[in-house]
């Protein structure tokens, strides 16, 4: 299992598809549609913010914990499906979901007790057991690291209104804080080998040379880990040469 991680607008979904097409495996995307909790979560944020502005310093969003456990459950179900075949690609990591629960807690939308319970649940779910038939962590975690400017440029390009800083200026601070949390998360991550891709340097969507460079970096790591045979690796290398002709 190969898992893609990275902040909003980093290019996770694009690289997930590129990599799955390259390896001939299945892509499993972040569950964002048909989410019954998301609308009431956003409404809960508004209500909690108004209450805090009126002096209720303890006001939280009653749906913050619910939303994150919903994502946790959906993500774990995706892991079980993706694990059924070698080198399937997962769009977003269950591990990085903790970043968003932590952010909700720091912003006052969730309580410290809720965060501790969520964190304990995540760790219990993902704990590797020596007698289990399969492990739950990925064979390789690929993280796309981007700067604030690159993130905003891509957010504008894809045009989701609720992500735009000109629609909601408070997102500027939120995005900067989120970038810092991702930096901390990358430094602490130890559940599997981690490969960091420079999303500022490589435009793997629009530029063929950049795409090949990123693919070769990932595939070299997969060869090293034993997820690709030498013959498979050489076949992919030849395909890259053909692409660049």
Predicted regions mapped to residue ranges:
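Hydrophobic anchor at the beta1->P-loop junction of P-loop NTPases
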Residues: 4
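P-loop (Walker A) phosphate-binding loop of NTP-binding proteins
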Residues: 7
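Conserved lysine of the Walker
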Residues: 12
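Hydrophobic positions on the alpha1 helix immediately C-terminal to the Walker A/P-loop
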Residues: 15, 19
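Conserved substrate/cofactor phosphate-moiety recognition/catalytic segment
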Residues: 21-68, 73-74, 99-103
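Glycine-rich phosphate-binding loop used to anchor ATP phosphates in small-molecule kinases
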Residues: 59, 63-134
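A glycine- and Lys/Arg-enriched "phosphate-lid" helix/loop adjacent to the NTP-binding pocket
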Residues: 100-180
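NTP-dependent small-molecule kinase module
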Residues: 156-245
